[in-house]
Amino acid sequence: MMTPQLILASTSVYRQALLRKLGLPFEYCDPNIDETPIANESAQALVLRLAQAKAEAGAKYFPDGLIIGSDQVAVIDSKIIGKPLNRDNAIQQLSQASGKTITFYTGLALYNAQTGEINAQVEPFTVHFRHLAASQISAYVDKEQPFYCAGSFKSEGLGIALFSRLEGRDPNTLVGLPLILLTEMLLSQGIDVLA
């Protein structure tokens, strides 16, 4: 059996840029799944379910692929927050986060469409926000417009100035694709990124 083609089941330019760091050829597709949370679903269960669903949805387009699915949410004050989608929501999310700790949960799934084998795990990452003035929040939102980023920031850009501390095993997790975990999963499928 030949090595399956690597597929990223995501249209996120941020996830694509992260995956390019590994130097492996890949294609991407839009998994186009229903991302509605189930009543009383925990953040970890939600991202695990959606990462698996995205990876499995990619098999429609690439039936012999090795498909990566990923999903991320942030939790603040025990509530799941997602992408703000507009300026007002972004300001509200960052105002709520000011001076607090937010945990991001990123679900990562690797689905071998040839064998039906799936490996799915959740990688946490914790962000400690500085105490931010309303003017700082507005200025940041206007400069980076993080409307499609969970938690309303881009940590790979100016968003780093919002934080006092980061905690986690892989900073790539915060951007949306835990590469350390992914390389471990790929190795279990016979793909060594260092070979």
UniProtKB/Swiss-Prot annotation:
Active site annotation, chain numbering: 71 (proton acceptor)
Reaction(s) catalysed by this chain's protein: N(7)-methyl-GTP + H2O = N(7)-methyl-GMP + diphosphate + H(+)
UniProt-listed Enzyme Commission number(s): 3.6.1.-
Cofactors required: a divalent metal cation
SUPFAM superfamilies with a match to the protein in the record: ITPase-like
Main location per the UniProt record: cytoplasm
One family name in Pfam for this protein: Maf
NCBIfam families, per the entry: maf
PANTHER family for the chain: 7-METHYL-GTP PYROPHOSPHATASE (PTHR43213:SF10), BIFUNCTIONAL DTTP/UTP PYROPHOSPHATASE/METHYLTRANSFERASE PROTEIN-RELATED (PTHR43213)
Protein name per Swiss-Prot or TrEMBL: 7-methyl-GTP pyrophosphatase
Species per Swiss-Prot/TrEMBL record: Shewanella oneidensis (strain ATCC 700550 / JCM 31522 / CIP 106686 / LMG 19005 / NCIMB 14063 / MR-1)
Highest classification ranks of the organism: Bacteria, Pseudomonadati, Pseudomonadota, Gammaproteobacteria, Alteromonadales
